[in-house]
A protein has these predicted regions:
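Membrane-water interface at the C-terminal end of transmembrane alpha helices
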Residues: 33-45
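Heme-based O2/NO sensor domains and their adjacent alpha-helical segments
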Residues: 131
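Long, hydrophobic alpha-helical segments that serve as membrane-spanning/inserting helices
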Residues: 47-118, 123, 134-234
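Pore- and pathway-forming membrane helices of multi-pass small-molecule/ion transporters and channels
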Residues: 1-35
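Extended alpha-helical interaction modules
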Residues: 24, 37-40, 50-55
Length: 234
């Protein structure tokens, strides 16, 4: 656009008020057409929503797998080696990174697309993925499986079963608080190995709490318009 205007000015040799007004009008029309065309460029919303579904399905699988491993220890009480889990974990990490890139691309390619929500969503899942890895690390380091592991496994299944974009996690946080109170009320183990394993289990539970708190904060940070548009709630 600037090149066109400069060409006109050089061709004219001199510029009167009428010429300046004409060039200003040309600039206005050209810019306006560009903006309108940009507004109607198909956004990447469909691709991002597809990425969201893929990411959520992977989270559900990982949480369910973690619950199963925690609730069904090996013959000597040790946790499984988790090789299958690691493959799922790697796939989820890649999906989250790809989803975040798509959200940024949507922001760059369209003026009207409300990518603030998508960027916040992908940021949420990225942080939750990091927590999930730390949680898994806590459980895998347990040399024996405490009795309380079954309760935590049930909670993980609850999280997996209700894992969804529109879940604000408030009910799950209440359930988690109940599990924490149960664990605190039980006597401490005598043997060192049992003590360390229960401590790791509790650390994993605290990571799960942070996992849910992030979702609660994400939900509370949404505007009414975002809830209506992206969650379908008025």
């Amino acid at each position: 656009m600037n090149t066109v205007l400069m060409t006109h000015i050089l061709a004219e040799g001199s510029m009167g008020m009428a010429d300046i007004a004409n060039e200003a009008l040309l600039l206005f029309v050209g810019t306006g057409v560009g903006v309108v065309l940009n507004l109607y460029i198909p956004g990447s919303g469909t691709a991002i929503r597809s990425a969201q579904r893929e990411i959520e399905e992977m989270f559900i699988s990982l949480l369910s797998r973690m619950a199963s491993e925690l609730g069904t220890p090996g013959e000597n009480g040790e946790q499984p080696d988790g090789r299958g889990f690691q493959a799922l974990e790697q796939a989820l990490g890649q999906a989250v990174e790809q989803g975040e890139r798509r959200a940024y691309e949507g922001m760059e390619n369209s003026l009207l697309a409300d990518t603030r929500y998508y960027l916040a969503y992908m940021g949420l899942r990225k942080n939750q993925f990091a927590i999930l890895c730390r949680m898994r690390d806590c459980f895998s380091r347990m040399e024996s499986t405490p009795d309380q592991a079954l309760v935590v496994a049930d909670l993980l299944q609850s999280v997996s079963g209700s894992f969804h974009e529109r879940n604000n996690a408030l009910g799950l946080l209440d359930e988690l608080e109940h599990v924490k109170l149960q664990m605190k009320a039980q006597p401490l183990p005598v043997r060192r190995q049992e003590f360390e394993s229960r401590a790791l289990l509790y650390l994993g539970l605290l990571e799960l709490e942070q996992f849910l708190v992030l979702k609660k904060e994400f939900a509370l940070g949404l505007s009414r318009d975002e809830i209506r548009r992206f969650w379908g709630r008025g």
